[in-house]
């Protein structure tokens, strides 16, 4: 018999650096989940991706057990890393803060394609390029 689901928790956490401090502690504590068990499991599974922000979906069951699914890093984080910038532009249509190539957009799409709803590679690359433009990053050939 399958376990009954109590709820879902969605968080974005730095890989290998989950700790009981907010936002993890309050979100998991409200559902009655063992916070330290989650932190240890998460840090063990993400130690090779250190420094990246990873979305995680935690499924909490009525017996207070949990499972979690790791997603690929947000496109904005990958684009900032590719363009070697700390933040996007405050005025993306006026100020350009960095450059990425279409080849870099294709590499980001390959990392993100499991989590994206683009029909094919060309549409996925256009989506990533659109995200870059909205951040003030110029897309060059």
Curated annotation (Swiss-Prot):
Record CDD domains: Ribosomal_L11
GO molecular function: large ribosomal subunit rRNA binding; structural constituent of ribosome
One Pfam family hit: Ribosomal_L11
Gene Ontology terms: biological process: translation
Family matches, as InterPro entries: Ribosomal_uL11, Ribosomal_uL11_bac-typ, Ribosomal_uL11_C, Ribosomal_uL11_C_sf, Ribosomal_uL11_CS, Ribosomal_uL11_N, Ribosomal_uL11_N_sf
PROSITE patterns reported for this sequence: RIBOSOMAL_L11
Modifications made to the protein after synthesis: One or more lysine residues are methylated.
UniProt superkingdom: Bacteria
Record keywords: Methylation, Ribonucleoprotein, Ribosomal protein, RNA-binding, rRNA-binding
GO cellular component, one term: cytosolic large ribosomal subunit
NCBIfam families assigned: L11_bact
Annotated family: Belongs to the universal ribosomal protein uL11 family.
Function of the molecule: Forms part of the ribosomal stalk which helps the ribosome interact with GTP-bound translation factors.
Oligomer and partners: Part of the ribosomal stalk of the 50S ribosomal subunit. Interacts with L10 and the large rRNA to form the base of the stalk. L10 forms an elongated spine to which L12 dimers bind in a sequential fashion forming a multimeric L10(L12)X complex.
Protein's name in the database: Large ribosomal subunit protein uL11
